[in-house]
């Protein structure tokens, strides 16, 4: 055998071996792929889809939800009964083809099964998600329905337990409960017949009506309590109190109290009847009006009771106060009468008792009977309180004015005493001033000083004459005393000025000698000042004339002389 043939045979054998090895490798790989596909299929088969479907079945879906569930359930049935069987068939076919080394067809079957499994996986995911959505939706719907029913049942139970608290509104509340119950029944009917949208709307209304009725029923007991308990109790209390006050002889300015009681009763009854409509705002407003009427009645009674306490206390004070004021008036009258014998008293308000007497007589005739018959007259105590308070105010004013008269009376005799003391003092001062002027050895007395002196003397004389009368005019004495006091003070001041002007003029005239020989103006002023001093006795004008001339030649000289004089000035010794 030639070497070429041998090489050919060897090559063929090698190719066969290589082909076999490749076939074995491909077959092994395909076995692995088929096994993986088998595992994927088994994992899908093992998914709890059927259990989830059974759980959803237990929810008793209705309407659109039930139709949706049926579609997904049918899809799962198709997958579990047909698709998986078809995959099993193709997997067996792929195994057979792979075992027979028909790798191309085997690979085709493997790819086909892979594609089918991918589609099945996606379908199963969709099925499970749809089932979960149905479960969640049903749970929400169920929870919503349960919540609405719980609200209704709770409300129904609460109303049943507190039925007595709703008064006349109970029939309307029961009617509302029946309407809500009918709405729930309608919801169940619609839900069962597969109309979930309308059923949801009905459920919404039922829930809203339940909540609204609950809010209303929470407010009703407080309103009913006022109408059935509070107001009647207050009205009974008012009527009982009114009867007791009448028995105790109370009287009221308001003459329609019985009518007001009746109006309150009618308002309570009317509001109770109107509450049937469940118009709570109107009922509350009306309750407030009723309470205001009741409060006004309480105010009337409390005002009279309080007025009684004040008026009763005042009725004990007024007689004593009146007696005290009358006693004061009598004492004042006696004192004024005594003083009238000695003094001329003008009929002025400060010493007049007429207004006091009139006030006291009016109280005695118009008020005292009410005081003495307190508790027996048919007068409201509020009226008596006002009358008595006004009376006490009048008595207080009378007493204050009486005290002023007492003070005025007390000062009358002291006015005379003080005037007599001043009279003696003023006469003495007048003599001392006269002697003081005489000692000055002046060339003459200025006319204006003489006028002041004689005027003061006349005023002192007038005071002496007034005090010498049998009956002294005390007002005239008081006036003359004041006038004389001022006159003496003015005369004393005028005396000091005259003496000062005269003394300073003499000093300045002497001092001017040092300038007269060479200052013509000083010489001229000297002559004029000397004339005013010795002839006209106008010491003030003389001082002004010479001081002005000296100031022109020696500024400040006048102040120097004035200061020196003031330090050594002689005072009148009274």
UniProtKB/Swiss-Prot annotation:
It holds the Pfam family EzrA. Keywords: Cell cycle, Cell division, Cell membrane, Coiled coil, Membrane, Septation, Transmembrane, Transmembrane helix. It comes from the Bacteria. It is found in: Cell membrane. Its main location: membrane. Residues 104-141, 275-343, 473-525 form a coiled coil. The chain crosses the membrane at residues 8-26. Residues 27-574 are cytoplasmic. One of its GO terms (biological process) is septin ring assembly. GO terms for cellular component: plasma membrane; septin ring. InterPro entries: EzrA (IPR010379). It is a single-pass membrane protein. Signal peptide: none annotated. The keyword RNA-binding does not apply. NCBIfam families: PRK04778.1-1, PRK04778.1-4. HAMAP family: EzrA. Negative regulator of FtsZ ring formation; modulates the frequency and position of FtsZ ring formation. Inhibits FtsZ ring formation at polar sites. Interacts either with FtsZ or with one of its binding partners to promote depolymerization. Belongs to the EzrA family. This is Septation ring formation regulator EzrA. It comes from Streptococcus agalactiae serotype V (strain ATCC BAA-611 / 2603 V/R).
